[in-house]
């Protein structure tokens, strides 16, 4: 059984500090116990930053497409201080960015990196609600999927669900309607599981390949290295100080 996850960041953030991020939310008691660890860790990472200057999390509240773009940006770049996001405000190709305000840079970056897609009419709809499948599509692109455009067409949600299921991202959300608008705590759970998944690369000849398998230069044998976004960008490890394969 997997152990409780903790974070080891550049500033040596510990699990107790991560948990305190959750406890600091005035509405922490309203967070579903199943999703509490996800909220703990992502809030501790500053990927989720809460409302009212971090006082509330609003776990059952709907989340917007703009908010998810901001979260995916932080996970993908590790820029949790949003230091560079303004550089991408002009990257937007969508026609409805005039009212996007604070979210322009996040959306611009994610669109430029092909992590988010707009609608056929050329809009992004930043204030629109987002479904569980849409959240999964965004974060799975960050992991490396959709390079073969499998998240396009009428069956895109089915392909998203298949990949998410294969990677055990859905293990705690059985019975949840992922085609409905997603709550903030559900988004936290989906993202938390996804950032533990090995990143992949794609070639037409070989399809998707797990980049955690790398060649040892000394032995020329394949060895495993933790390639997940959580580990690469945030040094996310288990509570006993080991990575995904039990190594210190």
Each model region followed by its residue ranges:
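Contiguous, function-dense segments enriched for cysteine-driven chemistry
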Residues: 185
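Mature N-terminal segment immediately following signal peptide/propeptide cleavage
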Residues: 39-49
